[in-house]
Structure formats: structure tokens, C-alpha cells
Amino acid sequence: MSRIGWCLAMLSFIAAEPAFAWGNQGHMAMGLIAYDRLAAHDTAAISAIEALIAQHPDRARFDSLLAGLEGSERERRLFELIARWPDDIRATRWNHTHWHHQLRVVVGWKAFRGPRLGEADSAFRRNLDILRDFLAKPADRAIALCWVFHIVGDMHQPLHAGHRQDKYFPLTDFAGTKGWVRRSADAAPERFHHFWDTPADRPGDEFAGAAAIAAAADRPFVAPPSGDALADYRLWVAESERVAAEDAYPDAMGAEGDRPEKAGVLAPEYVERARLIGEKRIGEAGERLADLLAALFPAN
């Protein structure tokens, strides 16, 4: 198959299988981590973000979920909701399916490892530009803010940056959305992508789960921002590609089936390692998001 034919086939997959990155809990945990970092060092950014979201065209959605909350509790919840908003509006006019990923083949065949499919890179740049433009409509800047939050989270999920292509998945497994696994012998089959969206999720209430992830998330030292947000973003994506290639796929390829009835069982050690990786990537995303927001909304 030619590269053009392969790209066209992949685009049809992308249209048919929208991919989520992290579950709500993961995105919300990232928002909490970013909020806590800003609350300790850059409270002006929090106030500016609150004021901007007040101009959001989907403000009613936020207001309904913030009802009864005040002070820091309300602010923390707002950051959770901003981070997940692009997933909440999948069925609305604000949806952009291709903004959630930028995929490259990282394991298997080498012939097609060059092309990167998706629009996350251009969407991140576009929304940063809108957010930085103080002459833009406040409603547009508020939407852009939500997408900046979300894309930072999305692109820390390894299967939103890298996927598999080999004889078992000749058109790729499209970041695991075409592959099936089971977390344990008695678990139901799930898409491999879904497994990597939710490795750190807790059972029960998603807000409680997000708080638990944020509390447990590994927050290693992250390099200070370079001053070039796009260059920093490209480094984060490269990290996710490496995690996909070195951690997500190698020990799971034998378990990944191409339909539910062929879903293999992931080793318990793999499931636990995925949880730790998920918590680490969510922690890194939250810390980096806080740095980015502090730069975007400096104190006067």
C-alpha cells in the first residue's frame, strides 16, 4: 500500500473511532494538580481564568456543576471542569474529533513511521494564539482555554501519540481503539486504548476518584518551561511516543486481539505498572499546565 493510500485508510479509521485521552478522572486530576500549584504561587492566574470562563458560551454547563460551591472548593472544581470540557461537548458544535491526538507508528513495521495523523499539534498552536490575543472575543478565548487544558492532558497519554502497525494490525491498531484486552481473567474485554485512558481511575464517584489520583500522582521534578510553549509541547509528545514504544506496547502486544472474543489477559504486573505510569503522566501534565497558565496569565 502506498503512503497516500495508507493515510487515506487511516483517516477513515480516525473518523469512525474517536479516541478519548484519560477518562474524566485523569483530566480532572490534572486540573486539580494545576490548580494547587497555581494556588501556592500564582493566584492571579486563577482569578484571570475564573473571569474568562465567565464569558464562555457554554457557561450554563459550568454553572450547573458549580452550584452550591464557594471559594477554593469552587475554584478547584472549575479547573476540573475546564480540563474535561472538550470531552463533555463531543455531541455539540464545539467538538473537534481530530484535536485529541497526533499519532505516529512507534512499534512494528517501520515503513510508515514518518506520518503523524491527527490535529493536536496544530490545535494546540491555534488555541494558544487565540488565548494570547487580547483583542479576540472573550467567548473564543474561553473556548481556547479549555482546549489548551485538554490537549496538554491528551498528549501526555501515550496512546494519543503512538500506536502499533504489524501483520496483526496492518492498518495500525489506531492507538488501541481497534485492539481488545482484559485487565484480569474475569474482566470483560475492553479496547486497549480505553485501558490506557483509565489505568489510574478509581471506582465510584468520579470527583472523588480524581481527587484520589491527584493526591497519589507522582509529581517528579519537571524542567522549567523554556519560554517557547510549542517547543515544550513537542517534548511532551516525544515523551509520550517513547512511553508508548517502550512501556505500553511491548508487554501487551501478545494480549491485544483484533476483536473482543480474542482479547487476551494483561499480566497483573503490567496493569500495576500502567497505573503508576498513568499517575506519573497525569502528575507531569498538571505541573506543566500550571507553568503554562502562569505564563499566559501573569500577575500585573
Mark where each language-model region is.
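N-terminal, motif-rich segments that launch catalysis or mediate targeting to/interaction with membranes
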Residues: F20-I151, P158-N300
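Bacterial N-terminal signal peptides that target proteins for export
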Residues: M1-C7
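N-terminal signal peptide c-region/cleavage motif recognized by signal peptidases
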Residues: A16-P18
